[in-house]
Structures are given as structure tokens and as C-alpha cells.
Amino acid sequence: MKPLDNLCHPVSVIKDAEMLAAEAFGAKHAFFIVNGTTAAVQTMIFTSCKAGDKIIMPRNVHRSAINALVVCGAIPVYVNPGTNKQLGIPLGMSVKDVEKAIKENPDAKA
């Protein structure tokens, strides 16, 4: 049924939605993943890194990213996320810390 489309090979409404998402995010392409976040995270790492490549990531990264590093052999460059002192929860990486990691690791692939 063409109107319902197929996530594995979009040709109509899903393809249109992916194109709209890419436009909204200022990207060349956007792809909706079929197998959930773990597959999406691992796909991002597998497509951007190979054995020995450095990848900059937060120290509290999801275990799916760690598993991808083990499988592909990429080397993590960890950036410690900030912490919300009032709530005691981790925040994202600061722009300053990411810029520092990039300057210290200009050979990082991602």
C-alpha cells in the first residue's frame, strides 16, 4: 500500500517526511531508522569511524555507543559533561569543552 510507505525503502509519505526533516535540520539528508535508538547510534559510529579513528563523545555516553566502539575499534576521546548542581544530574557537553577536545584532537573523525 503505497500511501502507508515502508521505513526500509521509503518512496512516498515517509520519503517526503525525511526530506522535510532534512530541510528543518539544515542537513543534506535525514533518515528515519527502523531498529530504534541503539541501531541509530551504532550506525552513526560505524559509518563515520573505523579501527584506530578517534571519536569525541561525552563520558556518560549510552552503552550502545561503547558497544559500537568495541566492534569497530574506534578510540573514544571523552569529554566530561557538566552537572546541574541543584538537581545533581549530568548535562550535555559544553561548547567550550567540545572546542577544546577538537583542538587537542584535530585528527578525530567525529
Outline where the language-model segments fall:
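Substrate-binding/gating loop at the entrance of the active-site cleft, primarily
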Residues: 57-76
